[in-house]
Amino acid sequence: MKAFVWTLSVLLFLLGSGHCKGGQLKIKKITQRRYPRATDGKEEAKKCSYTFLVPEQKITGPICVNTKGQDAGTIKDMITRMDLENLKDVLSRQKREIDVLQLVVDVDGNIVNEVKLLRKESRNMNSRVTQLYMQLLHEIIRKRDNSLELSQLENKILNVTTEMLKMATRYRELEVKYASLTDLVNNQSVTITVLEEQCLRMFSRQDPHASPPLVQVVPRHSPNSHQYTPGLLGGNEIQRDPGYPRDVMPPPDLPTAPTKSPFKIPAVTFINEGPFKDCQQAKEAGHSASGIYMIKPENSNGLMQLWCENSLDPGGWTVIQKRTDGSVNFFRNWENYKKGFGNIDGEYWLGLDNIYKLSNQDNYKLMIELEDWSEKKVYAEYSSFRLEPESDYYRLRLGTYQGNAGDSMMWHNGKQFTTLDRDKDTYTGNCAHFHKGGWWYNACAHSNLNGVWYRGGHYRSKHQDGIFWAEYRGGSYSLRAVQMMIKPID
């Protein structure tokens, strides 16, 4: 198309040149007619000339030259030097472009090879990633299976522990029945003896001879196989009434024949859910009944069973010590006091190690409830409570006091725990030996809640070894019931 335009421009140029020459002839004739007087020299000088400016066309395509019927002069007139220069420039530029394209093609070839290598490496990498992903997936599945097995094992252990506690509770109920039946048989034996003496007085009319001491037909205390730890120091005879001889029953009044069962089995609530970190968390979870709960402190891997007291408003108290009837001997060694002993639904000591773990997982306060033999209850509460570790012999840390029982515990604040076989008090002797229990003795005690349980209040003893609170009833009065409880500070 460009060649056609260029050819058309050349034709127009040629036509314009011919037309100009013809016009000059016509003008010449006209001027000769108008100015006949002019000389030939002047006329020749007055001839007009016309120059047509045709825009120069750049040749961008091939040039076709037809030499037939044209001579060299005509071709020379048709193709100018500038056109040739332009053609040379075009050819040079195209050559440079071809060289550049050749370089690009070479570079593209290298890039293509690199792309192929990268694609191959990418496929290998994808295969490796897939393999690693499958391995990771298998590992996750295996760990999940192990976690599931561990959870199932923990549930089995929890269920077995629950069954053991149920069996222990049933055994405790049987013990209560056994003790009641034992008392009944012993009372009947005493009654029979008294009746025999009366019969002898009536029918023989002779003075009765002094009868031997009455012994129990059935032992009052059966072995406590469900206690926390064995190994009493001194035996169960320490827990006795001070006024009665050992192994002798007091002569009672003549009883009437019982028509109902003489004993009442205490109702024990056992909570299967948990474990909880303390009784407050169990109460917040909706368990408002007092009973045996499964507890697992945050800084411990072991489980423990203890009594949660919710009858005191607002509830959530964790019981760490309880005295009610003297059925458990508290005159024990260090190992017993460390691990704990007793019956969860009766008298027990939770254990120094367990108390340490509980009191150090949060900020706790302590409340001690005391009951005398007239059934009057008082309390002493301390704003903070915790124990130091065993390396410091479970040193006691207490806060400020409030309550109506008087402060008999601050005397023991900051003191280490003492037992018969580990003396850590400030007295020259062993306070545990004199007070018959384990406690945070100073020199020696203003309170002795792990002492001997005496019946009736005031007792006779060489040493003040009863359960006493000096600021309430004094050191010669043994309290009827005591329980120590802790709870997180509000």
Swiss-Prot record:
Disulfide bonds join 279-308, 431-444. Residues 270-490 form the Fibrinogen C-terminal domain. Residues 79-167 form a coiled coil. One of its GO terms (biological process) is cell surface receptor protein tyrosine kinase signaling pathway. Glycans are attached at residues 159, 187. It is found in: Secreted. GO terms for cellular component: extracellular space. InterPro entries: FIB_ANG-like, Fibrinogen-like_C, Fibrinogen_a/b/g_C_1, Fibrinogen_a/b/g_C_dom, Fibrinogen_CS. PANTHER family: FIBRINOGEN ALPHA CHAIN. This is Angiopoietin-related protein 1.
